[in-house]
């Protein structure tokens, strides 16, 4: 039986399985696919990765906040995380979704919360990446990024190759000298807004990698796909793009040896390290993004 992307996306939305994962799954996931239940418990993992030459970006799992109070709590938690990264001298960025700061509640609330976060990030020179979510929230997310990029240096965002609009988005952002993380995309979207065929997504991914790098902007190529890694290496070689102009990003717990090999080859390699109790939906979406990762994922989860 071929395990498909839609299968994992279906599982990611299961309330029952999510509840089960919260109740007992964190013991399995912690240290295998997530750093821990909170940021402080993830610090030893960050230190270990840093000692191997790997940079990190941390992400507190859990989005779609529907309370202003919870959104402000998430904001304060993020501010404390940034301060701790600086105090502990960890080589780490911070990633966060705008829905966790109140995107679905009130835009003024999001701007209030992001202003506080980025003021702290600028003070400590810690990069904050605004994660991209589903297509219906894409424009609002990009508008937020554009507004803050005009005022702050330490802010980046994410673009998804499976959306038709992404090449134009890169053109629209060009004047801001943006640091972009480029991904294929993991949400289930209509054929009206996204490429339905993997081959088309792959070709568009190459196209946006090429455009962003040749535009001269720092780029994070977030992929486990060897073909995309090799494409990026060859592109950089052909156009004389220095290794300090881009980085590769991979998920914690997947393809660890490949990550270390890239470091040995002289490439920047950053590990996406999530933490928190809401790990199940994240895990299923990552498998949906590339079902072949299932072997790497479960090997990592069962390794002692």
From Swiss-Prot:
Gene Ontology molecular-function annotations: FAD binding; proline dehydrogenase activity
SUPFAM superfamilies found in the cross-reference section: FAD-linked oxidoreductase (SSF51730)
InterPro entries: FAD-linked_oxidoreductase-like, PRODH_bac_arc, Proline_DH_dom, Proline_oxidase
Active-site residues annotated for this sequence: 131, 181
Pfam families: Pro_dh
PANTHER family named among the record's database cross-references: PROLINE DEHYDROGENASE 1, MITOCHONDRIAL (PTHR13914:SF0), PROLINE OXIDASE (PTHR13914)
Protein name: Proline dehydrogenase 2
Organism in which the protein naturally occurs: Bacillus subtilis subsp. natto
Taxonomic lineage: Bacteria, Bacillati, Bacillota, Bacilli, Bacillales
């Amino acid at each position: 039986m071929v395990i498909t992307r839609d299968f994992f996306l279906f599982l990611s939305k299961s309330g029952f399985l999510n509840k089960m994962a919260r109740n007992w799954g964190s013991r399995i996931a912690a240290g295998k696919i997530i750093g821990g239940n909170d940021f402080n418990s993830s610090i030893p993992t960050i230190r270990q990765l840093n000692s191997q030459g790997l940079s990190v970006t941390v992400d507190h799992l859990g989005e779609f906040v529907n309370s202003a109070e919870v959104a402000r709590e998430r904001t304060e938690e993020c501010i404390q995380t940034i301060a701790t990264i600086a105090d502990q001298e960890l080589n780490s960025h911070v990633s966060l979704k705008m829905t966790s700061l109140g995107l679905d509640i009130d835009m003024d609330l999001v701007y209030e919360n992001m202003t506080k976060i980025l003021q702290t990030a600028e003070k400590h020179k810690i990069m904050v990446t605004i994660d991209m979510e589903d297509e219906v929230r894409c424009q609002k997310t990009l508008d937020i990024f554009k507004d803050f990029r005009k005022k702050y240096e330490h802010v980046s965002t994410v673009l998804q190759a499976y959306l038709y609009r992404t090449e134009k988005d890169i053109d629209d952002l060009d004047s801001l000298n943006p640091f972009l993380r480029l991904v294929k995309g993991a949400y289930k979207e209509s054929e009206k807004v996204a490429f339905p065929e993997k081959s088309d997504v792959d070709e568009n991914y190459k196209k946006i990698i090429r455009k962003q790098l040749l535009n001269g902007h720092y780029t994070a190529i977030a992929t486990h796909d060897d073909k995309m890694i090799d494409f990026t290496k060859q592109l950089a070689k052909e156009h004389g793009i220095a290794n300090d102009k881009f980085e590769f990003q991979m998920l914690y717990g997947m393809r660890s040896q490949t990550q270390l090999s890239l470091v040995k080859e002289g490439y920047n390699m950053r590990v996406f390290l999530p933490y928190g109790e809401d790990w199940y939906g994240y895990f299923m979406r990552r498998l949906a993004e590339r079902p072949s990762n299932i072997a790497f994922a479960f090997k990592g989860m069962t390794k002692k």
